[in-house]
């Protein structure tokens, strides 16, 4: 209802007015336990060091994840739900689920691209092989709690940097999901939307301001939040992320403009995560569902 309200009320005299605001997004980050890397004799493969050297490609990351796996216990957990691994891999492959034409509310489903299919397959292979924990059905906090306890060396897609950095008893490392060529991903799916309330007395003035602000990303002062709890390396990483966001490199995946976990879409994704349907079949099944949902916002 809120999303529908936003797109309807964001219209004035035939023109659509929307704005977005971002925070210091950490969902593209990978947190890792340097102590466990050392225990596995993998401290020579420090992820952030490799990233700064331009050597951490997605395939290199996957190789390290596999090398950290002993055939019994997974090396990696994914924050909140395992599907977030598929999402991050889609960004690493250079695509997304839903895109938007800048300055408008015209959305397109891009989940049917070859890039997303290949990304989902790579992510699902890691789940199926046991390299990554399939925590479907667990509490949304399970992965971050297990990582914080020191039970797994790698946490992908963490939105809990502040809590983990404040409370972990191990040497914490961080990097960003790399794309296939080794460039750090800078893409999010959680943005703030706003619309003009119907009873505003000066809607034209509000619309003018919002129209000027549309498609801008506002950075926040993250330094006071993190500078006393993270290492200099992690702080440098946050600085780099902030600079890229402000420079206009931040991309947005708009799949949250619809509820992908309803109307059958989520059920298909859950079948894929459980391994009962292939990524290609899942994507084929949900592509038209997503397109149909997006039509309600035209």
Where do the PLM segments sit?
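Short, solvent-exposed loop/beta-turn-alpha elements that line the ligand-binding surface or hinge
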Residues: 1, 51-53, 96-118, 179-187
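A structural signal for short loop-to-beta-strand junctions that line the ligand-binding cleft
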Residues: 1-37, 183-187, 195, 248-255
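Extracytoplasmic/periplasmic solute-binding protein
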Residues: 7-30, 38, 54-108
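Extracytoplasmic/periplasmic substrate-recognition and gating elements
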Residues: 11, 166-227
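Short helix-initiation/N-cap motifs at beta->coil->alpha
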Residues: 53-60, 134-148
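Glycine-centered hinge/linker elements that transmit conformational signals in sensory
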Residues: 61-67, 100-137
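Paired acidic/hydrophobic, glycine-rich loop segments that form the ligand-binding mouth/hinge
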Residues: 153-158
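Conserved C-terminal helix/tail region of periplasmic/extracytoplasmic solute-binding proteins
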Residues: 198, 203-204, 217-298
